[in-house]
Amino acid sequence: FGPFEAVLLHLIQILKPHTEIIWIDNGYNTHATYKFADKLCEQLKLNLKVYTPTMTARRRDARMGGIPEVDTELHLQFTKQVKIEPFKKALKEIQPEVWLTAIRRVQTVQRAGTDIVSADKNGLLKVAPVLNMTDADMIAYLETNNLPNELDYYDPTKVYANRECGLHNRD
């Protein structure tokens, strides 16, 4: 439920209402993100399935001393705990045929070279319908369709805007 996520969620609801929407609630979302998620779920009537890490954020913070520095082994463990493991659990339970993702070329160097349709490392078909959209395109879509946006978003697995979150390069 980060910036511009409403675009993909709206497209999904138009094309295939009642699609199961996976949200990995890592426990580090801002208050605004939770309010945005509630508002968008109500507005779009989303069939939301929430997956969380096994360990709470508070307990993990106590063990790891807070969110670990990026590019360290501890941060890799952190990412696996808060994002990869809940995502794997979601895939195992839901067993989707397709993973629709809101990644866009303008977001990171890795995403700039991504194909709209690909298979991930585990063979799951991954489709990025908004891959070629710019920020201006996304804003125009939000405005045209009277959709909210969430800019007070923080992803502790990325930390910096130009890093990957772990899902698109998971084991």
PLM regions and their residue ranges:
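Nucleotide-activated chemistry modules centered on ATP-dependent adenylation/adenylyltransferase
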Residues: 1-171
